[in-house]
């Protein structure tokens, strides 16, 4: 997705921050829905991914378990983390140490079917 006229301007990362990018087209579509559903919580999740994508785990932010704990992305296996943004809203992302980036691979106000 190339930015166009009237699109949001993404803030450039500073050296200590991680670059947050979409890893799938579905995540890019779901991001706007999630922002409309829970703007404040989605912003807090964005800031957390950007500043500390592997914080101490708690009830709303943790690495996924089992078969979902890792995901292949761009030919490499990366850890897969989840942030609970709302009752059902979720963000799944992959911290990429080599690129100092976070790849958002799922974002939606709906609960992911893979975890049901």
Predicted regions, residues:
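Basic, Lys/Arg-enriched alpha-helical interface segments
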Residues: 1-89, 95-116
């Amino acid at each position: 997705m190339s930015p166009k006229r009237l699109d949001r301007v993404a803030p450039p990362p500073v050296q200590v921050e991680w670059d947050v990018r979409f890893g799938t087209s579905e995540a890019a579509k779901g991001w706007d829905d999630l922002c409309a559903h829970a703007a404040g919580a989605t912003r807090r999740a964005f800031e957390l991914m950007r500043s500390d994508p592997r914080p101490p785990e708690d009830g709303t932010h943790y690495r996924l378990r089992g078969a979902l704990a890792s995901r292949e992305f761009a030919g490499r296996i990366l850890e897969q983390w989840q942030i609970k943004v709302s009752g059902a809203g979720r963000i799944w992302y992959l911290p990429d140490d080599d690129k100092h980036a976070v790849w958002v691979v799922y974002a939606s106000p709906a609960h992911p079917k893979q975890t049901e």
